[in-house]
Amino acid sequence: MDQLSAHLDRGWDLAQKGDASGASACAKRALEIDPQSPEVHNLLGYTSALSGESEEALEHYRQAIALDETYLEAMLNAAEVLMHPLGEWDEAIDLCDDALEYAETKEEMADCLLLRVDALLGKGDVEEAKKCMARLPDPPFENGSYVFLIGRAYYELGETEKAAPFIEEAVRVDPSHADAHYYLGLLRDDAGDTRGAVESFLRSRALDLAKPPPAWAPSPETFAQLVRRVIQSLDALLGRWVRDADVYIVDVPGAELVVDGVDPRAMVILDARSPDEPLLPGEPVGMQARLFIYQRNVERSAGSVLSLESELSSGLEREITAVFLDRDSASPPEKHQLN
C-alpha cells in the first residue's frame, strides 16, 4: 500500500470512530502528498463536518467534485451538509440529482434517492418525496442496511404499512440493530400494540447503552457545565420555568420510565407544574420542577461536539413549550418529537 492510501485508510478508520482530530491529521498528511487528490478533499470535508465546520466541509467537498465531476460520494456528502445543518434543501436536491446521473449500482441509486427523499421532507414536499420513493430499485441489495433505510423513509413519510415489512426484516436480519428495534417500537406504538412497543423500545435502549460513546463525547463534568450554560442562556420567557429546577443528568431514560411510556431516546424530560398550581399533599414547599437530561441521547442527536449546545437548547425549548405553554393547545404535541 502506498503512503497516500495508508493515510486515507487510517483517516477513514478514525473518522468512522468519531475521532475528528485524528482523521483530520491523517487527511492533512495525505494532502501534503497529493494536493490534487479528490479522495483527500472528500476526507477533509468529512472530518470538517464531523467537527461541526459545515462551510469548510462544503468547500472541501466542492473541491473534490471539481477535481472529479463523477465523484458520487463527495456529491452525497455535500448534500448531507447542505441539508443538516445548513437547511439548503433545494441545493441538496440538485446535488442528489447530479449524483443520480453517475449512479451505476442499485445501492448507489438507493443512496441518491433516499437522500433526496430526506431533502424533500426537510423542504416539506411530502408528495414529491413519495414519488421519489417509487423510483427506488427493488431489493435485494448487497448491503442489508438498505432494508432498514427504506423502511425508515416510508415511516417518516407516514406510510406505516409499507414501512413495516422492511423494518421487521431489518430486525430479523440484524437483531443487534438498535435503530431498527426503535422504529419497530414506533410502528407497534402507532398500531396500538403497547406491550410489543415497550419490548422493542427496551431492546433498542439496551443496544444503545451497549455502544461506546462517541470519541468526541464530553466528560460528565464538562457536559454538566454545558447544561448549566444552556439553561442560563434560554430565552427569558422559557428560562423562568427551569432556572431553579433540580437538574439530573444520566445516560438514557430508565427502563421503568420506558415501560411507563417514555421515549427511550428522549433528550430531555421536564417533570414540573406551573408555579400557580397548588401543592400536592406531602409535596415540599418550593418544589416546582425537576429536569432530566439524557447525555447519550443528546450526543446521538447532535452528531458532533460543536452541535451539542444548539441541540440541547432546541430540546429544552421544545420540552418547556410542550409542558407549560402548549397545555391548553387544541392539538397535543407530536409523539417522539424529541427525535
Cite the ranges covered by each PLM segment.
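Position-specific recognition of the canonical hydrophobic site in helix A of tetratricopeptide repeat
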Residues: 15, 42, 49, 83-84, ...
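Structural marker of alpha-solenoid helical repeat scaffolds
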Residues: 33, 67, 102-105, 139, ...
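Active-site scaffold of zinc-dependent metalloenzymes
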Residues: 270-314, 323-339
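Canonical tetratricopeptide repeat
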Residues: 9, 43-46, 77-78, 115, ...
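Start-of-helix register in tetratricopeptide repeats
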Residues: 5, 39, 73, 108-111, ...
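TPR/TPR-like (Sel1-like) alpha-helical repeat modules
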Residues: 98-101, 172, 178, 186-213
